From Swiss-Prot:
It is found in: Nucleus. Its main location: nucleus. Residues 395-405 have a biased composition (Pro residues). Transcription factor which may play a role in oogenesis. Binds preferentially to the DNA sequences 5'-TAATTG-3', 5'-TAGTTG-3' and 5'-TAATTA-3'. This is Homeobox protein NOBOX. The gene is NOBOX. It holds the Pfam family Homeodomain. InterPro entries: HD, Homeodomain-like_sf, NOBOX. It is linked to Premature ovarian failure 5: An ovarian disorder defined as the cessation of ovarian function under the age of 40 years. It is characterized by oligomenorrhea or amenorrhea, in the presence of elevated levels of serum gonadotropins and low estradiol. Signal peptide: none annotated. Changing G91W: In POF5; uncertain significance; decreased transactivation activity; decreased nuclear location; intranuclear and cytosolic aggregates.
Length: 691
């Protein structure tokens, strides 16, 4: 059974389209007769779909009903008259534009309901773009064109046909979607069978079956037929021109959709390369000045900076441009002004961002340099891998008394804790008011338990020879510096460094004043009289007399001091008080000359890795302390007894009394005379020191 679709045009007469199983056909000549139906001049019938047993009228009503009568004919009595084959491939159009609310479609029979549901989307889609203004404008009033003639030209003028057909040969164009507000057109559907018609007219409207001739459809050359010459959506059959049209339509729509979707992203996703902003020297100076004031300017300040500096808008940045319009008043800036300010502020933001990165980099480099090179001008103790404290030089005020050149002295504590000394016995002083500098620590060799004996071990740069431990005739500490406080210091562990690396003082000043080296100067009283330690990282050195060395023994009640290399029991060890202080007494005369450039002490009372065996000392010698300082060559020294040990009371404080004033007057003391020497020294100490 062939399915006939008749589409008419309001402008042309004598043409109409039919569709059967072989495809779409355009026919010329008198249109096929359809059963009569109500129509008036403003009823624009733009589609008549029919078959042998039924037909559907697609119409749009704009005014009251008028009946159009036409002779009754069999719907498809002469279906083939002057056929012209036209290939029809097109897109979809909607059928519902210009509808009014309040119109209900005609009821269709049960057999046609299925056809209506299947073809309704296509019919709705094909209506809107093909309707002439008379159908698309709601409320438009047109004078009635026809009344009572069956095949009149005005009665046959209908709206332009849709561009789509039913998707299957058993389906046809169907009812419209549910009516929406403001729409006047509806797609009433009437089921017509031979000798019997059933339809439900709209409320308030009386309809009679009328027969009307099908109005001809438009041809491609007509003035208003551009919309009428259409290519309907192809059907769903798999054979013939309909199938080809379906394929072509699907491909065309998919290509259009793909082009439509892909087109805009290509335009919006264009990536613009960033250009560098070139600044003049005056702009850079201004920006640098502002950066020194504030490293992190906010958006308002960046905008002010951009206006002040006059940055040209050379690129647009996303960051920093969001809050540029905040706070503006008045009529409001134009789009060009906003873009200009945004660009300028963004450029200023980029400059500050780069400048902060450079600033952080410089801060890191400066921090590393300050760690590598400490800011203190004095020497550090060492750069070893221990966690020992870095000991910088401690400058001291110069003294008016002339000081000969001397080398740093080291201490020799107990073996487990090698203590460091960063202080010289008699600090060096240049000829004119320079400051004396504390020397780096010198470490003792690891011998057996012994006292803290500070000895000059480092070399000096002058080769002069000088007498050692000479007492000035009639010298008394009262005429030198007055009472001297103890060198109140604390003890720190030395870093495990090589001893030979620390023999040379890192910072010391040499004097150009020739003369004998004398331990005749006490430290500055104002600096060291306070009981609180001024140099808390130095071991204790209570130097009390011009010619004496006062040493604190370890807090060991069983402390034994080796008095000579011979190791004799009666002479080699002098048991001392647990809390007393050892005072070293110089020999009673010139015992020879020694060079400070020789770091070895041949007659020290203890063995060491760098000090050779005592030169020429008799095994059972008479002195507790042999000659302290060696000569450059093993020459015979005066065998004067070394300074005897004197013990100070526990509460005694080193002061200005002549501890060893009788040293020159005493003859060389034998080992049997040592107790009397100790008693004399103790008595003198009690008389001379103020507790």
């Amino acid at each position: 059974m062939a399915l006939l679709l008749t589409l008419t045009s309001p402008d042309l007469e004598g043409t109409w389209d039919t569709r059967d199983k072989d495809g779409f056909k355009a026919q010329e000549g008198p249109p096929l007769a359809v059963p009569e139906f109500p129509v008036c001049g403003l009823y624009r019938i733009y589609g008549v779909c029919g078959s042998f047993s039924s037909f559907f009228i697609i119409r749009c009503s704009l005014c009251a009903l008028e009946t159009l009568k036409s002779p009754q004919h069999d719907p498809l009595e002469i279906p083939e008259q002057s056929l012209k084959l036209i290939p029809l491939v097109s897109g979809k159009r909607e059928l519902t534009r210009g509808q009014k609310a309040g119109e209900k479609p005609l009821a269709a029979g049960p057999g046609e309901e299925e056809l209506l549901r299947g073809s309704a989307p296509h019919a709705q889609d094909t209506q809107s773009e093909e309707l002439p203004p008379s159908c698309t404008i709601s409320g438009e009033k047109k004078p009635p064109a026809v009344s009572g003639e069956a095949t009149g030209a005005d009665a046959g003028r209908l709206c332009p046909p849709p561009r789509s057909r039913a998707p299957h040969k058993d389906r046809t164009l169907a009812r419209s979607r549910p009516q929406t507000q403001g729409e006047d057109c509806s797609l009433p559907v009437g089921e017509v069978k031979i000798g019997k018609r059933s339809y439900s007219p709209a409320p308030g409207k009386q309809k009679k079956p009328n027969a009307m001739g099908l109005a001809p459809t438009s041809s491609p050359g007509a003035p208003n037929s551009a919309r009428a010459t259409h290519n309907p959506v192809p059907c769903g059959s798999g054979r013939g021109p309909c199938h080809l049209a379906n394929l072509l339509s699907t491909l065309a729509q998919s290509n259009q959709n793909r082009d439509h979707k892909q087109g805009p992203p290509e335009v919006t996703c264009q990536i613009r390369k960033k250009t560098r902003t070139l600044y003049r020297s005056d702009q850079l100076e201004e920006l640098e000045k502002i950066f020194q004031e504030d490293h992190y300017p906010d958006s308002d300040k960046r905008r002010e900076i951009a206006q002040t500096v006059g940055v040209t808008p050379q690129r647009i940045m996303v960051k920093g441009a969001g809050s540029l319009v905040a706070g503006w008043s008045g009529g409001g800036p134009t789009i060009e002004t906003l873009e200009l300010q945004s660009e300028r502020s963004a450029v200023a933001w980029v400059w500050f961002q780069n400048r902060r990165a450079k600033w952080r980099k410089m801060e890191k480099l400066n921090g590393k340099e300050s760690k590598d090179n400490p800011a203190a001008p004095g020497p550090a103790s060492s750069q070893c891998s221990s966690a020992a404290e870095i000991l910088p030089a401690v400058p001291m005020e110069p003294k008016p008394d002339p000081f000969p050149q001397e080398s740093p002295l080291d201490t020799f504590p107990e073996p487990p804790m090698l203590l460091t000394s960063d202080q010289t016995l008699a600090p060096t002083q240049p000829s004119e008011g320079a400051q004396r500098v504390v020397t780096p620590p010198l470490f003792s060799p690891p011998p057996v338990r012994r006292a803290d004996l500070p000895f000059p071990l480092g070399p000096v740069h002058t080769p002069q020879l000088m007498p050692l431990l000479m007492d000035v005739a009639g010298s008394d500490s009262s005429h030198k510096d007055g009472p001297c406080g103890s060198w109140g210091t604390s003890i720190t562990l030395p870093p495990p460094c090589s001893y030979l690396e620390e023999l040379e003082p890192q910072d010391y000043q040499q004097s150009n004043q020739p003369g004998p080296f004398q331990f005749s100067q006490a430290p500055q009283p104002p600096l060291f009289q306070s009981p609180q330690p001024k140099l808390p990282y130095l071991p204790t050195f209570p130097f009390s007399m011009p010619s004496s060395l006062t040493l604190p023994p370890p807090e060991d009640s069983l402390f034994m001091f080796p008095c000579g290399p011979s190791g004799g029991t009666s002479q080699g060890y002098c048991p001392g008080a647990s809390s007393g202080q050892i005072l070293m007494q110089p020999p009673a005369g010139n015992i020879g000359t020694a060079s400070w450039s020789d770091p070895c002490l041949p007659e020290l009372p203890f063995p060491g890795p760098f000090c050779p065996q005592a030169l020429g000392h008799p095994p059972g010698g008479d002195g507790y302390f042999p000659d302290l300082f060696p000569t450059p060559c093993p020459q015979a020294l005066g065998r004067q007894p070394s300074s005897a040990l004197s013990w100070m009371p526990e509460g005694a404080r080193p002061g200005t009394g002549p501890l060893l004033s009788k040293a020159k007057e005493e003859p060389p003391a034998a080992s049997l005379d040592q107790p009397s020497a100790l008693e004399e020294a103790r008595g003198d100490d009690k008389n001379s020191h103020v507790p």
